[in-house]
Amino acid sequence: MSESPKKVIVGMSGGVDSSVSAWLLQQQGYQVEGLFMKNWEEDDGEEYCTAAADLADAQAVCDKLGIELHTVNFAAEYWDNVFELFLEEYKAGRTPNPDILCNKEIKFKAFLEFAAEDLGADYIATGHYVRRADVDGKSRLLRGLDGNKDQSYFLYTLGHEQIAQSLFPVGELEKPQVRKIAEDLGLITAKKKDSTGICFIGERKFREFLGRYLPAQPGKIITVDGDEIGQHQGLMYHTLGQRKGLGIGGTKEGTEDPWYVVDKDVENNILVVAQGHEHPRLMSVGLIAQQLHWVDREPFSGTLRCTVKTRYRQTDIPCTVKALDDERIEVIFDEPVAAVTPGQSAVFYNGEVCLGGGIIEQRLPLPV
């Protein structure tokens, strides 16, 4: 007697990647069902209300593919485990990455548990551009085949056990192929543009959105030489290496080079700026990271040669990683790197394999 097909619950976002993932899994012989997660409660009459449109698109795709679509509300989990932490980080003058937190707490925790326990799933699947491979009996996380779309940076907190229960069908394809499949199938999501903005909160005006939850405190903008040259509307609206939105031009005596944020003095509510994107104050020789997650879940000790990304879409930087203690590591880059930002994630790679990462606690500035 043949075994019954394994059951996969696909996280349907209403986008093209999850739509095509569901179809690919059907082709591979899985019993496929969809799940739409509502993770944010919109205010009534909110103009950015995309959740209803996304749900309608997800439903249309599931109808077309002949699969059931479940819905679940994780808004409370999102608020408690992602959003409150996100606000705390901003309050402390750091720049968090909510997508990483959301993957850790919602998609690969709340969703994974709900799919297994309530829906009887053998696996979950998402439309992430990553791959998995089994090495020495443990599931490893690999970069997506499409280097331009690879999303392993956002999934470094996953352990091998979570990866073993997750399928990533589009990780083996390039984005144009995914769009072509959706077009050939006549899916409503074929030409839908990729979502940007904060995970699940969508493309709302960020400044206005943040201002609802955190009181903005205007303060001085000073240069690295100590001259006051303007006012900022709130430190939380600025991040290291930022050039746009400072509202200052070149100075009378100085060059016309654009200004960049090089530091945030949280205690005194001062934004520090310098001219030129390779200003020494913007460069770091390394970083200290904490809140470490290694995919193989083995504690790290000693030293390691690998590459690191300190933000998404960055070219890999060769580096040496040294364990300081169980909780923290020191990372020294082979060459100085601009705009290393506390609160963001440092993610480590050995070739195609994502090893894990941690949160940047501090950057190690160029010796003056």
Swiss-Prot record:
Residues 97-99 are annotated as: Interaction with target base in tRNA. This is tRNA-specific 2-thiouridylase MnmA. ATP binds at G11, M12, S13, G14, G15, V16, D17, S18, M37, G127. It comes from Citrobacter koseri (strain ATCC BAA-895 / CDC 4225-83 / SGSC4696). Residues 149-151, 311-312 are annotated as: Interaction with tRNA. One of its GO terms (biological process) is tRNA wobble position uridine thiolation. It is found in: Cytoplasm. One of its GO terms (cellular component) is cytoplasm. Catalyzes the 2-thiolation of uridine at the wobble position (U34) of tRNA(Lys), tRNA(Glu) and tRNA(Gln), leading to the formation of s(2)U34, the first step of tRNA-mnm(5)s(2)U34 synthesis. Sulfur is provided by IscS, via a sulfur-relay system. Binds ATP and its substrate tRNAs. Its main location: cytoplasm. It catalyses: S-sulfanyl-L-cysteinyl-[protein] + uridine(34) in tRNA + AH2 + ATP = 2-thiouridine(34) in tRNA + L-cysteinyl-[protein] + A + AMP + diphosphate + H(+). The record marks H128, Q344 as: Interaction with tRNA. The active site is at C102 (nucleophile), C199 (cysteine persulfide intermediate). Its EC number is 2.8.1.13.
